[in-house]
């Protein structure tokens, strides 16, 4: 019997042995920087002249690796392979599929610091953020494997004396996985393994700025015994390969994590029925947020300031769950703001490969330019009291930025920034604070810092987000503990790491036999 699920513990880097082990992981990754990685279609490794070049966002001159780039023709080949492989994979035993996930999790656990080091180099994650990303990848595999074992025999339904009824789940078909750059291991691995353990075959198109960690994960799946053709690795451009596969009549479902605009585009394209298509495509989408921490006047103000700073600036604010707005009761606004500024000025920004770094770079030049444009907007809409500077000479570094005294209807309070910028806004009372928090087209995460039980219960009912936290920050959902997904334009509320997530990758079948 499989042991009960528990989340992978985070590494304590204050322990010297762990620090040394992580440094060894960095050395290992540095030893193979710049390598070429092929496409993988039906187990065949295919090298193309056209490449996706992955660079270190902390050092633009350092190439992490070059990954072959799929064309439409190769995407079509991958679709044919995945479609054919599905005919056998869908009949494979769920226990066997789960065992592959458990083996893959064990392999990653043994190579944990190596994978985290890839994330340091390719995604610009500081040690603790990279370690958490890798731990979450392990968690997804361990959790989804166990969930499949629970679902393999279906769910009991009622029968009558003269009949026997069964309710079971069967796989959907070929799934297109379009994974993000901000959690390029955890979310990519979670989306991929959820699809395959449910009996589907996969076309994996990772984010173009972080394809190397996905290529390394393909090695893990092969070592874990995954048959060729179940997961096909096809990095490529969204406009060429992504659109082609979303439109393809043999695509059964699309699992996407990324921006609102791209998510909407995928949703619209997937709704169109193409010639030869005999189903309605399913879309599983997580699309971002404009997340708020509300601070009540009856609250632990030190906890409030620490929660805001950690949630706003962890991984440079590049989390869909990051705190982008701090809405604070006017009676305690100045105290919380001043303390948050103090804490922010203590943060170190620099090379994430160095242990003491709190914040690394943003993802790429486009991200840098976008965030700095919002810093400029912040100068007009409020007062910059911390940060406000950026330097893209070597890498894409932006100082953690607090914009104070922002009006509730300002752009900084409405638009997703996806960087280390947080707007502070005053609220007249708790009801006003909740109204400001809900005044957005998103609904992903939120937090309330309060010692008032009535206010906590009011927020539990009225704060319209998919993941709501009390007296803590608004980031850091744990697989199996806080299933993750949001409302409104944050996506389809597909709760990753939750008990109903695998069912999104399957269809229910009822059989009834007369006795």
From Swiss-Prot:
One of its GO terms (molecular function) is 1-pyrroline-5-carboxylate dehydrogenase activity. Pfam families: Aldedh (PF00171). Coiled coil: none annotated. Pathway: Amino-acid degradation; L-proline degradation into L-glutamate; L-glutamate from L-proline: step 2/2. It is an enzyme of class 1 (oxidoreductase). Its EC number is 1.2.1.88. It catalyses: L-glutamate 5-semialdehyde + NAD(+) + H2O = L-glutamate + NADH + 2 H(+). InterPro entries: Ald_DH/histidinol_DH, Ald_DH_C, Ald_DH_CS_CYS, Ald_DH_CS_GLU, Ald_DH_N, Aldehyde_DH_dom, Proline_metab_enzyme, RocA. GO terms for biological process: glutamate biosynthetic process; proline catabolic process to glutamate. One of its GO terms (cellular component) is cytoplasmic side of plasma membrane. The active site is at 286, 320. Keywords: NAD, Oxidoreductase. Belongs to the aldehyde dehydrogenase family. RocA subfamily. PANTHER family: DELTA-1-PYRROLINE-5-CARBOXYLATE DEHYDROGENASE 1, ISOFORM A-RELATED, DELTA-1-PYRROLINE-5-CARBOXYLATE DEHYDROGENASE 2, ISOFORM A-RELATED. This is 1-pyrroline-5-carboxylate dehydrogenase. It comes from Bacillus cytotoxicus (strain DSM 22905 / CIP 110041 / 391-98 / NVH 391-98).
């Amino acid at each position: 019997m499989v042991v009960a699920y528990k989340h992978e513990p985070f590494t304590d880097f204050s322990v010297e042995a762990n620090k040394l082990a992580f440094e060894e992981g960095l050395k290992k990754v540095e030893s193979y920087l710049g390598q070429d990685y092929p496409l993988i279609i039906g187990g065949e490794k295919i090298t193309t002249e056209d490449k996706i070049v992955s660079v270190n966002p902390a050092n633009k001159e350092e190439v992490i690796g070059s990954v072959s780039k799929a064309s439409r023709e190769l995407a079509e080949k991958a679709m044919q392979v995945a479609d054919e492989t599905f005919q056998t994979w869908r009949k494979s035993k769920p226990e066997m599929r789960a065992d592959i996930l458990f083996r893959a999790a064990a392999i990653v656990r043994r190579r944990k610091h190596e994978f985290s080091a890839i994330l340091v180099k390719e995604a610009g994650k500081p040690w603790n953020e990279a370690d958490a990303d890798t731990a979450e990848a392990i968690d997804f595999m361990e959790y989804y494997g166990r969930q499949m074992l629970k679902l393999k025999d279906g769910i009991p339904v009622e029968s009558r004396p003269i009949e026997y009824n069964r309710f079971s789940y069967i796989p959907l078909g070929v799934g297109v996985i379009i994974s993000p750059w901000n959690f390029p291991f955890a979310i990519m691995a979670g989306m991929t393994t959820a699809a395959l353990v449910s009996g589907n075959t996969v076309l994996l198109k990772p984010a173009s700025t972080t394809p190397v960690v996905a290529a390394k994960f393909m090695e893990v799946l092969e070592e874990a015994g995954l048959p060729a053709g179940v997961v096909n690795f096809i990095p490529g451009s969204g406009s060429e390969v992504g659109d082609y596969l979303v439109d393809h009549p043999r695509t059964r479902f699309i699992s996407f994590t990324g921006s609102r605009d791209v998510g909407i585009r995928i949703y619209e394209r997937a709704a169109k029925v193409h010639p030869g298509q005999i189903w309605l495509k399913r879309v599983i989408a997580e699309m971002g947020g404009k997340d708020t921490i509300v601070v009540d006047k009856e609250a632990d103000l030190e906890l409030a300031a620490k929660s805001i700073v950690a949630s706003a600036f962890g991984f440079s604010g590049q989390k869909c769950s990051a705190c982008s707005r701090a809405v604070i009761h006017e009676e305690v606004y100045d105290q919380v703001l001043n303390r948050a500024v103090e804490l922010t000025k203590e943060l170190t920004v620099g090379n994430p490969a160095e242990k003491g770094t709190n914040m690394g770079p943003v993802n790429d030049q486009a991200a840098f330019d976008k965030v700095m444009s919002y810093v400029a907007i912040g100068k007009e809409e409020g007062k910059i009291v911390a940060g406000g500077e950026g330097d893209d000479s070597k890498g894409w570094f932006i100082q953690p930025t607090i914009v104070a005294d922002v009006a509730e209807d300002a752009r900084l309070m409405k638009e997703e920034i996806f960087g280390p910028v947080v707007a502070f806004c005053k609220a007249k009372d708790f009801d006003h604070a909740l109204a400001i928090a809900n005044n957005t087209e998103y609904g992903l995460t939120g937090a309330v810092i309060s010692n008032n039980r009535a206010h906590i219960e009011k927020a539990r009912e009225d704060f319209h987000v998919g993941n709501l936290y009390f007296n803590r920050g608004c980031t850091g959902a744990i697989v199996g503990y806080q299933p993750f997904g949001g409302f409104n334009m944050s996506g389809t509320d597909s709760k990753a790491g939750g008990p109903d997530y695998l069912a999104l990758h399957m269809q229910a079948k009822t059989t009834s036999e007369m006795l």
